[in-house]
């Protein structure tokens, strides 16, 4: 296993959601620096009590859901990367030759926004809290894109938020992940290293396991009560002409194996499907195409993954992190 540096919670910027919502110029500058230099930052939610209350409510709902028998959960399997249930061990994991070891449940933003009737029962039964939470986080991330656009001097159709028009289809979704308790890693482990496919990811978890790759090696990203972890994805990196950093990360047990059930809530903001940008090879691709290719690559074997740069978004070469310098 790779050497992992000690916790680095003090090394990542902590930004105030309240100050960003208030369009504070200094906080917006710090936001740009964090997204360009680290690709990760902590977002202080402690002034937003309802958001934290809703998170705790959703966490309890999803714990009960994941505890249901597998055959019951498989009724929500849509064979989709944005909707429904997915069992453990469907993609390549952290250890060579072994699969991942997490299960997930996804709720599509398209479905919530359009109030479709085919929502899974657990969502339909608790629609008020799912709807309120997703819409608030969605608006927070669009606001963050707006602050980045403003600080970088981007105007009109060149603004980042213009690629996320409300009525257009998108791969955006709310995802819940459970890393089950294990006695051994022989059946799989963790979540393989990757960059996120979209624009911004909003993470909430009270448990350790998330790591990001730096020029010095792998570092823990410590959970902080009352804070979300936000990170830049490939699409935002490409839309920013590679000024902003989509950083490689993974999830691993803190010890030799997963000693307790670990839960994560993630909101993945992604551009509208037909948004176009230049990928790591300078080719014009749509956001939908990049998303689908990347998720197909998640399911490929480790040997196949080594022959393509898409999983790491072009941010790794010969297992070394590629660092891009940013001047404010």
From Swiss-Prot:
Top-level EC class as recorded in UniProt: oxidoreductase
Keyword Oxidoreductase recorded: yes
Keyword Phosphoprotein tagged: no
Pathway: Mycotoxin biosynthesis
Fe2OG dioxygenase domain span: 170-271
InterPro entries: DIOX_N, IPNS-like_FE2OG_OXY, IPNS-like_sf, Iron_ascorbate_oxido_reductase, Oxoglu/Fe-dep_dioxygenase_dom
Use in biotech settings: Pneumocandin B0 is the starting molecule for the first semisynthetic echinocandin antifungal drug, caspofungin acetate. Pneumocandin B0 is a minor fermentation product, and its industrial production was achieved by a combination of extensive mutation and medium optimization. Inactivation of three of gloP/GLP450-1, gloO/GLP450-2, and gloM/GLOXY1 generates 13 different pneumocandin analogs that lack one, two, three, or four hydroxyl groups on 4R,5R-dihydroxy-ornithine and 3S,4S-dihydroxy-homotyrosine of the parent hexapeptide.
PROSITE patterns, A to Z: FE2OG_OXY
Top-level taxon of the source organism: Eukaryota
Pfam annotation, one family: DIOX_N
Residues bound to 2-oxoglutarate: 262
Binding locations of Fe cation: 194, 196, 249
Cofactor(s) recorded in Swiss-Prot or TrEMBL: Fe(2+)
This enzyme's EC code(s): 1.14.-.-
Molecular function as annotated in GO: dioxygenase activity; metal ion binding
Cofactor annotation remark: Binds 1 Fe(2+) ion per subunit.
GO annotation, biological process: small molecule biosynthetic process
Record keywords, A-Z: Dioxygenase, Iron, Metal-binding, Oxidoreductase
Entry's family note: Belongs to the iron/ascorbate-dependent oxidoreductase family.
Role noted for this protein: 2-oxoglutarate-dependent dioxygenase; part of the gene cluster that mediates the biosynthesis of pneumocandins, lipohexapeptides of the echinocandin family that prevent fungal cell wall formation by non-competitive inhibition of beta-1,3-glucan synthase. The 10,12-dimethylmyristoyl side chain is synthesized by the reducing polyketide synthase gloL/GLPKS4. The thioesterase gloN/GLHYD exclusively interacts with gloL/GLPKS4 to maintain turnover of the polyketide side chain.
UniProt name for this protein: 2-oxoglutarate-dependent dioxygenase gloE
Organism of this sequence: Glarea lozoyensis (strain ATCC 20868 / MF5171)
Originating gene: gloE
